[in-house]
Swiss-Prot record:
Topology of this chain in the membrane: Peripheral membrane protein
Transit sequence range: 1-59
A GO CC term attached to the entry: chloroplast intermembrane space
Protein name per the record: Protein TIC 22, chloroplastic
Subunit structure: Part of the Tic complex. Interacts with OEP61 during its transport into the intermembrane space.
Function: Involved in protein precursor import into chloroplasts. Imported into the intermembrane space via the Toc translocon. May be involved in the import pathway used by proteins without a cleavable N-terminal pre-sequence.
Compartments it resides in: Plastid, Chloroplast intermembrane space
Top-rank taxon, per record: Eukaryota
Signal peptide: none
Organism expressing this protein natively: Arabidopsis thaliana (Mouse-ear cress)
């Protein structure tokens, strides 16, 4: 048990909850139509593991004294074990969609395998050579975080069920949309073990509800589930100093409990 209590970064949720409309719709058909529009031109690029992360760490200072932000490897470690799905060819190259507005080549990363399969079907319609040599492959979020491909940006396609869950948790006046990949957290599930503190963050509302039912006696109305976006959490981790509380975040893969995930990490 720690002698001093660290601040829980998730309690400052006025900035954590997004209040603007989103490009991600809970209607899967609309999201697939959006993918079709981008898929007029397809390109391929190889996987590349870089030294710097795709999300730049922002240094902060107090009274002119440099401070240390969380390292890219520490942020990536928090993402270990969670897989997303994309489409690659037999050479292990991303199949990309090109923005017809003249922008970037975009790698699509799906939280559901079935969404990646739908993207693959569209890619095969657009390019003949992909009919036999393209496939859906998993890639872990820590690999995505450390991946640097020049000129390519990634777009996440969240689970539409979790978009719906996130909107239900938002205030009634702000349900027009949700920006980003929903993640869920509860102060009731923060774990303190020896000299460490762990703040589990879930990609599935059903998973966090299951955990709360096991470890707390709180009724459904008192479970204190908070919702934010993966992208926002990563930005805050990158900008935060050590011992700020953000280094305690650990992402729990969909379908896994905190205990199962920790066991998986020990085995690796």
């Amino acid at each position: 048990m720690e002698s001093s209590v660290k601040p829980n970064p998730f309690l400052s949720f006025s900035s954590f909850i997004h209040h603007q409309c989103t490009r991600f719709s809970s209607d899967l058909s609309a999201r697939i139509e959006d993918t079709k529009r981008f898929a007029e031109t397809l390109a391929t690029r190889r996987f590349s593991l870089p030294t710097p992360p795709p999300f730049a760490s922002v240094s902060q200072s107090k009274s002119g004294t440099p401070t240390t932000t969380l390292s890219p490897s520490l942020v990536a470690k928090a993402l270990a074990g969670t897989s997303v799905f994309t489409v690659s060819n037999t050479n292990n190259e991303f199949v990309l969609i090109s923005d017809p507005t003249g922008g970037k080549s975009i790698g699509l990363l799906c939280f559901r395998q079935e969404d990646a399969e739908a993207f693959l079907a569209q890619a095969r319609l657009r390019r003949r050579e992909l009919k036999t040599n393209a496939k859906v492959v998993p890639i872990t979020l820590d690999q995505v975080y450390l991946l640097k491909v020049e000129g390519i940006s990634f777009r996440f396609l969240p689970d539409p069920i979790q978009i719906k869950n996130a909107l239900e948790l938002k205030s009634s006046g702000n349900k027009n949309g949700f920006d980003g990949v929903p993640v869920f957290q509860s102060e009731l599930l923060v774990v303190r073990k020896k000299n460490r503190r762990y703040c589990p963050v879930y990609f599935s509302k059903e998973d966090i509800e299951r955990e709360l039912s096991k470890y707390t006696r709180a009724s459904r109305g008192d479970q204190q589930i908070m919702v934010g976006s993966l992208e926002d959490v990563l930005r805050k981790m990158e900008m935060s100093e050590k011992n700020s509380g953000w280094e305690d975040v650990i992402f729990i893969p969909p379908g896994r409990s905190y205990a199962q995930h920790m066991q998986d990490l020990i085995k690796e």
